[in-house]
Amino acid sequence: MKLAHHLTIRSSHLHINGQDCVALAEKYGTPLYVTSEDRVVEQFESYKKALGARYPKVQVLFAAKANGNLALMRALAAKGAGADVFSSGELNLALEAGMAPEKLLFNGSSKTPSDLKLAVEKGVKVSLDSLDELHQIDAVATAAGKKVKVSFRVNPALEVPTHPKIATGLATSKFGIPHKEIPAAYKEALVCTSILPVGIHCHIGSQILEVEPFVRAAEVMVRIAKELTEMGVKLEFIDLGGGLGIPYHHDTDPAPTAEDYAAKVIPVFKAGMEACGITPELWVEPGRSLVADSTILLTRINSTKKAHKRFANVDAGFNLLIRPAMYDSYHEVIVANKADAPLNAEYTVTGPICETGDILAPDRKLPELAAGDIIAVLDAGAYGYAMASQYNSRPRCPEVLIHGSQVALMRRGETVADLKAAMEQPPWQK
């Protein structure tokens, strides 16, 4: 199996950033998320370099929904990242991490009045998803005596090769305004009291392993930019979204890079802007491709069982990594304490949750396994802990961050006390 360079095998043990995964499991316990900060920064810098070499005004926003840990966001903020945020919670975390308000875009298809008020108060840009939202935020900004910079989210009506639940640019998607209706939306925005329409925004989907769909999205956005410029809209930024995928099947999936993306998309974008006579900032919103392969989930085998097939029952389930259950997603797995042992058996790796679908890795070629072995689930940094839950009243696990040779918790593990912390006893039960 191909491994990214921050993952190595030494003395039969899997290592991440030079740290022995078995030793980490012993020190911090399992289940345990382990993240390489250096890998996240490396991936971010690859976007900055590839895009910046081809277009002079680029802003890379981290899609905070992929992994909202403050430590990761601080590391990215230190390198100049902004963020695409989808809630007041993500907005507050991005600001606390040190991200500049002007580098934040508040996205979302169903923002609350308090979301809009917070966006205006903090001075961030807002991607509007409907005309209702336009008039709501105009009223909020007017009441506050402020102007708010906005874009509209464009639905480009593009078919993309990905799971239907994460294809966000389809004509039937809940996201955005149909691309043919965008000029009318901007006409309405131009006459609002407190609205400054300065951008356009799209996002076509996630885990896309081809560059061509992004080229088609850029073509749609260039056409819209031309129409808006002719209407008198002064575009300060055009956000092409994120969605570049990663090779979850390490040996067979294509692995388009930021360089591949830039080489195909930037010529289309740059030529379009030159034809319009404008030089807006280009914004992109990578999430998965920044953080997914930075992280592994370490989980210990509680027991093995032979029934109609062989099972390895581990202490992490879809409470901590729901992607396999939700999307039938594939994650490579390695036995961290037997990382170079012969793959002479087949197991289905299952979690502890009371659901038949709690399967992390079905029918995998693995070494002979026993209780106590440590399995590493790879590429768990995007939509892993971010989508974790306390289902079955299981406290969520800790997260560890590695920077160079330093290792530290970036989130403590929860306890039973945390499960009860927000619960109240009604007065009639006292």
Residue ranges and their predicted role:
Residues A63, K149-N155, H201-H203, D239-G241, ...:
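Short beta-strand segments
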Residues L116, D138-T142, K174, E188, ...:
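A generic local secondary-structure boundary/capping motif
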Residues M73, E96-A97, L116-E121, I137-V140, ...:
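Short acidic, glycine/serine/threonine-rich loops at helix termini
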Residues D20, S36-R39, Q43, Y47, ...:
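General structural feature for long, well-ordered alpha-helical segments within catalytic domains
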Residues M1-K149, K187, C192-L196, E230-V233, ...:
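A charged N-terminal "starter" segment
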Residues A66-G68, G89, S110-T112, S130-D132, ...:
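Active-site-proximal loop/turn and secondary-structure-junction residues that shape catalytic pockets
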Residues K2-L3, A157-N302, N392-R394, H403:
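Active-site loop/helix belt of alpha/beta enzymes
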Residues K264, K270-M273, G277-K430:
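Charged (often Lys/Glu-rich) extended helix/loop segments that serve as interaction or gating elements
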